[in-house]
């Protein structure tokens, strides 16, 4: 299945490369592993994926922002962004791969007003966020119109 065991991957230092290996292991596991193996190891890998934050993003969200299906899209439930770089988040909001998100956290206070506006417009215009139960937009400077759109 993989050259490294899941135990080795989970004990690796956090970072994008480690997450890429975990995601690759999960994709292979979904395709190849017997159900007993998945029952033991996949929940731990999913917990790592569910709690991973954007500051470790060096590639782990790659593919989730595509218009084509990502094999792990149904498993992605929570995403936290440390910044609101429109070039990074707007394709993410437009992708159907985020339809399973239940929690979305943003920290936007370091961005300029124009960047915030673009991010908020993309968020408000996304047709894929209907399952959100928690939305945090710290520092977004929401207006009454923004709240009405959300």
Model region roles, listed by residue range:
Residues 1-64:
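Terminal targeting and flexible regions in eukaryotic proteins, enriched
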Residues 31-32, 47-68, 75-149:
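Concave beta-strand-loop units of leucine-rich repeat
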């Amino acid at each position: 299945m993989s050259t490294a065991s899941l135990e080795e991957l989970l004990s690796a230092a956090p970072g994008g490369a480690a997450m890429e290996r975990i995601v690759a292991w999960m994709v292979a596991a979904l395709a190849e592993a017997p159900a007993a193996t998945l029952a033991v190891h996949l929940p731990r890998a999913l917990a790592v994926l569910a709690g991973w934050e954007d500051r470790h993003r060096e590639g782990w969200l790659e593919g989730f922002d595509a218009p084509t299906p990502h094999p792990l899209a149904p498993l992605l439930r929570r995403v936290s962004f440390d910044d609101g770089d429109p070039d990074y988040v707007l394709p993410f909001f437009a992708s159907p791969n985020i339809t399973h998100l239940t929690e979305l956290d943003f920290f936007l206070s370091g961005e300029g007003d124009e960047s915030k506006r673009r991010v908020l417009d993309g968020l408000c215009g996304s047709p894929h966020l209907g399952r959100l139960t928690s939305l945090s937009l710290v520092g977004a400077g929401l207006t009454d119109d923004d709240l009405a759109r959300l």
